Amino acid sequence: MAVWNPWHGCKKISAGCDNCYVYEKDAMYGKNASVIRRTANFDLPVKKNRRGEYKLLPQEEPVYVCMTSDFFLPEADEWRSEAWAMIKERQDLSFVIETKREHRFFKALPGDWGDGYENVTILCSVEIQRRADDRIPAFLKLPVRHKGILCEPLLEKLVLDAYLKTGEIAQVL
């Protein structure tokens, strides 16, 4: 599984964040996971080896983005346009971005987004029914070509039938 973490750290916003693995792991090393920082691998999608080939090669599986953060954090606003540019440049890769912050979507889009980039899937992360009922209706209104729902961490049974009937959700993880 290919992972690209352009920034690290997050701010807890819901019950699904209470036992966040990033906070636990960072605490083991004496780090504060609530401090958002750009990573050394920020430019991973466009890094090349000595032969001039991309280090991150196309695979059958997509590149998962921000597994130790949230792509739409306001603290990452200053870096996001550069991240979008790398995503656009690497049309040979498929990127999956999961978020609990669909409410920041329009504040964080590149100017040429239109109906979405063909190589980007956005997953709306939900953990309890109340959050699903809050986030998914707003998420369904967003201009995204490839939409999915991520049930993680799953804290209770979710009923998603009404959202799946729209035909806009391509996958539920």
Which sequence ranges carry the predicted segments?
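Conserved AdoMet/S-adenosylmethionine-binding subsite of the radical SAM
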Residues: 42-173
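Residue-level detector of secondary-structure boundary/capping sites
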Residues: 8-11, 33, 74, 130
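Short, glycine/acidic-enriched capping/hinge loops at junctions between secondary-structure elements
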Residues: 21, 29-32, 75-77
